[in-house]
From Swiss-Prot:
It comes from the Bacteria. This protein is involved in the repair of mismatches in DNA. It is possible that it carries out the mismatch recognition step. This protein has a weak ATPase activity. The gene is mutS. CDD domains: ABC_MutS1 (cd03284). GO terms for cellular component: cytosol. InterPro entries: DNA_mismatch_repair_MutS, DNA_mismatch_repair_MutS-lik_N, DNA_mismatch_repair_MutS/MSH, DNA_mismatch_repair_MutS_C, DNA_mismatch_repair_MutS_clamp, DNA_mismatch_repair_MutS_core, DNA_mismatch_repair_MutS_N, DNA_mismatch_repair_MutS_sf. This is DNA mismatch repair protein MutS. SMART domains: MUTSac (SM00534), MUTSd (SM00533). ATP binds at residues 638-645.
Length: 896
């Protein structure tokens, strides 16, 4: 196992080398706190700044582009220093966390004015990639998950718990039995967590595999201790009698994993309230199984921090709410196996598909609904502001209007099952209390409406009169002194003061008291100005404190109904998805599939939804497929680049679309329940694990053969091309026979081995199809139509021509090909001759002489190389390089 040394471990050594006794009280306080947070960058509040010292300062300077300065030298040692303003700290935290650092926020927890000695400071929260609560720095259409994984190798069980702490979602599930960890990897690939917690007993060999397989996501791995008495911890936290409430009875590993995750988050939040009201146990047996290869090969959703274009999500996501987009991403990765759930969603989609006016009206209402789910999270964390409550009010208003419209449609009115009375009460309270122009800050007043609180109104009147009187003083002093440019200004240091330019200094009366001299002006005060200043500032301070108190009273009341807000968010997401599916179906000419428990997979006029979206409208070539109890295994032949892979993937994608309740990209479709989809497509070495193309291919094929059932759908593309031709044919044949005879899964097997087409005669349910090719003189046109029968040519040279290979190379390739074909005929004749030797006609010797005359020494060398080369498996670039190598040999070079 590799030994990972973090930057924090290196800093730990440096920190120990600095003696605390030589420090100021402030630095002693810093170091004492830092000792507890050596794995984090410590942001230390000093006045209006968060400061970082020592190694933290150097890292912050490098990662954030901050100026690195030095604090006072102590015993000949400089203290590196970097700081950021407190009011903009969130953006700096987000940048550090995005780069994989954890940040500890150390705040002043007492008023500096009332402090005796040094101000008391404490770490108020720790922020890691998976525990960001500032939603302004998160992608609104993606969840930010943190996950925890535990493994029991004795019983072959893995448990995974995960949560998005900005939305309150908290789920857990267990995977048991054969290939448990492979399935766990697939689920982790779906979750795409930004941080993964590993318990201290997790087996290293599994963790290394986990890191290798999902390292491309840029995940932060964190080791955490196991929570003792995990079940008691959870029942205590959620204030429940039994864990059975969450369907977790006897699921010890799921309980322990959930406790580890919850405890970690709770510790980082330093006792702040969390948004979790329940743990949802997820039964993944009710979800279609999609392994990592299938998820990636089919381009279902983008990887973390990548755009959705070119994925199924990119095609299907025209949702108009953030909650809808986030939920859609989840359901694409987790297609239903429950036919009732599929048909229920289909019913809603169908209703909106047929009622265009209703659909467009609903989508217009939804456009004005904000991210209720994350606003609810902000209310729980206490980070909400006046703007958030106004957004919530508007969202409730639009939701209630939508509810009213849907109530007129009896068949679908239950889709927006919300707590109307509670939501209306929240709306009315926000409308009564919150100023429509409320600022973002909750500490500076201006949030609460006039007329709501009599004491607040009184203070505002005092403040206004005081400010009016100050304006009167300004006008009076201008007239008394004759200084037209005299101004009364305010700052936090001096309060209110009179400012006079140097040019008018000689006009200043004797009763003015000088407070400050500037380059171009002087600042003064007068007794009655200070008298009213005290009234204004006192009133302002009281106003801000009272407004904050009233604001928090309101949000506390709303917090008591937080479950109703989460319920609203969930219903809005589902409504958005089904109306979106109807919108997409209309826009892209999709059809409602017939889905059921039968065994027939039939798609007429099928298209690849992703490819179709990337090419000009109407240019995609449609194709059919039918797989049933008579023919459930297609052997698909045809040239490279002719559309075999696209055809196979479009079938898989349409199956998935049907299982999430969407319409499909076809003219009509009948799709059975498919429990698992497997795809083995493409050839590339796995650089992370050091596996060759062939080894990787065989590993994935083995997994398919061990896990597929007769309810599965399998896509195999060019199996066996990573080894020699005869080995490849043998393996491909055996795999095809095994799937046909032992598994019975619906399968499309694309191959360049034309020998496999003979299996149609041997395997009862196998059938040959090919990609149609039209030969027009010397040119070849790939029609991209799938027709019955096997292909008899590879058209490899034509593919090379389309790839831009130089004409000289193509011409030479044709000559070589003709010679090879001649040789093939000669060899076939030789075999016949060997059969005739018994009759003594000397045919064998004659053929050998003819072969010798046809091929020179260099040509024989080329022939030998070609015999061992799998031309159909080469990419265009590889073909070009190989052809160039052969050319050098033919003109007298070498193959060195």
């Amino acid at each position: 196992m590799l030994k990972y040394i973090s930057y924090s471990e290196k800093r730990k050594i440096k920190l120990r080398g600095i003696k605390m006794s030589a420090d100021t009280p402030l630095m002693q306080q810093y170091k004492k706190i830092k000792e507890e947070y050596q794995n984090e960058i410590l942001m230390f509040r000093l006045g209006d700044f968060y400061e970082m010292f020592f190694e933290d300062a150097k890292i912050a300077s490098k990662e954030l582009g901050l100026t690195l300065t030095k604090r006072n030298r102590e015993k000949g040692q400089d203290v590196p220093l970097a700081g950021v303003p407190y009011h903009s700290v969130a953006s700096y935290i987000a940048k550090l966390v995005e780069k994989g650092y954890s940040v500890a926020i150390c705040d002043q927890v007492e008023d500096p004015k009332s402090a005796t000695g040094i101000v008391k400071r404490e770490v108020t929260r720790v922020i890691t990639p998976g525990t960001i609560i500032d939603v302004d720095f998160l992608d609104k259409n993606n969840n930010n998950y943190i996950a925890c994984i535990k493994i029991n190798t004795t019983e072959n069980i893995v448990a995974i718990a995960y949560t998005d702490i900005t939305t309150g979602e908290f789920s857990v599930f267990e995977i048991k039995g054969k290939n448990f960890f492979e399935k766990a990897l697939a689920e982790m690939n779906k979750i795409q967590a930004s941080e993964i917690l590993l318990d201290e007993k997790t087996y290293s060999e599994y963790i290394e595999i986990l890191k290798e397989k999902i390292s491309f996501l840029g995940v932060k791995f964190t080791e955490v201790p196991n929570v003792r008495k995990a079940e008691s911890y959870l029942t205590s936290y959620f204030d429940i009698m039994s864990i059975e409430v969450f369907s977790l009875k006897s699921k010890d590993l799921a309980i322990s994993t959930s406790a580890n995750l919850l405890h970690y988050i709770d510790e980082l939040q330093k006792g702040n309230e969390l948004p979790f009201s329940k743990i949802e146990y997820k039964n993944i047996d009710n979800i279609m199984e999609l392994n990592i290869s299938t998820q990636n090969n089919l381009n279902l959703v983008p990887k973390r921090n990548e755009e959705a274009k070119g994925t199924l999500l990119g095609v299907l996501d025209n949702c108009v709410t953030s909650v809808g987009s986030r939920e859609l991403k989840k359901i694409i990765k987790n297609p239903f196996l429950d036919i009732e759930k599929i048909k229920q969603r289909q019913f809603y989609v169908d209703y909106f598909y047929n009622d265009v006016l209703l659909r467009e009206n609903i989508r217009e209402y939804l456009k004005d609904i904000y991210d209720v789910e994350r606003i609810a999270g902000k209310i729980i964390y206490g980070t909400e502001n006046g703007k958030d409550l106004l957004s919530l009010k508007e969202s409730i208003r639009k939701s209630l209007e939508t509810y009213k419209v849907l109530k007129e449609h009896q068949e679908i009115k239950d889709i927006l099952d919300i707590d109307v009375k509670i939501l209306l009460d929240i709306y009315n309270k926000i409308e009564l209390i919150i100023n429509i122009e409320a600022p973002f800050s909750v500490r500076e007043g201006g949030i609460i409406k006039d007329g709501y609180n009599s004491e607040l109104d009184k203070l505002r009147k005092i403040s206004k009169l005081g400010k009016d009187f100050i304006l009167e003083i300004e006008q009076r002093e201008r007239e008394r002194t004759g200084i037209k440019g005299l101004k009364i200004k305010y700052n936090k240091v001096f309060g209110y003061f009179i400012e006079v330019t140097k040019a008018n200094e000689h006009l200043v009366p004797e009763d003015y008291i000088r407070k400050q001299t500037l380059v171009n002006s002087e600042r003064y005060i007068v007794p009655d100005l200070k008298e009213y200043e005290e009234k204004v500032i006192t009133a302002k301070s009281k106003i801000e404190a009272l407004e904050y108190e009233l604001f928090k009273q309101l949000t506390s009341e709303i917090k008591g109904h937080i479950d109703s807000l989460y319920k609203l968010a969930n219903r809005i997401a589902n409504l958005d998805i089904v109306s979106n599916f109807a919108h997409i179906a209309t826009k892209n000419s999709y059809v409602k599939p017939e889905i059921g428990d039968g065994d027939i997979l039939e798609i007429k006029g099928g298209r690849h939804p992703i490819v179709e979206s990337l090419i000009p409208s109407g240019t995609y070539v449609k194709n059919d497929i039918i797989l049933d109890d008579k023919n459930n295994l297609i052997i698909l032949t045809g040239p490279n680049m002719s559309g075999k892979s696209t055809y196979m993937k479009q079938v898989a994608l349409n199956i998935i679309m049907a299982h999430i309740g969407s319409y499909v990209a076809a003219d009509c479709a009948k799709i059975p329940i498919v429990d698992k989809i497997f795809t083995r497509v493409g050839a590339s070495d796995d650089l992370l694990t050091g596996q060759s193309t062939f080894m990787l291919e065989m590993t994935e094929v083995a997994s398919i053969l061990n896990n597929a059932t007769n309810k599965s759908f399998i896509v195999l593309d060019e199996i066996g091309r990573g080894t020699s031709t005869y080995d490849g044919i043998s393996i491909a044949t055996a795999i095809t026979e095994y799937i046909h005879n032992n598994i019975g899964a619906k399968t499309i097997f694309a191959t360049h081995y034309h020998e496999l087409t003979e299996l149609e005669k041997e395997l009862e349910r196998a059938i040959n199809f090919r990609v149609e090719v039209k030969e027009d003189g010397k040119n070849v046109v790939f029609l991209r139509e799938i027709v019955k029968g096997g292909a008899d040519k590879s058209y490899g040279i034509e593919v090379a021509r389309l790839s831009g290979v130089p004409k000289e190379v193509l011409n030479r390739s044709n000559k070589i090909l003709k010679k090879l074909e001649t040789r093939k005929n000669l060899i076939e004749n030789k075999i016949k001759a060997e059969q005739m030797i018994l009759f003594g006609n000397g045919f064998e010797e004659e053929n050998e002489e003819e072969e010798t005359e046809i091929l020179s020494e260099n040509e024989s060398k080329v022939l030998e190389l070609l015999k061992n080369m799998d031309l159909n498996s080469l990419s265009p670039l590889e073909s070009l390089l190989k052809l160039n190598e052969l050319k050098k040999i033919l003109i007298g070079g070498t193959d060195e």
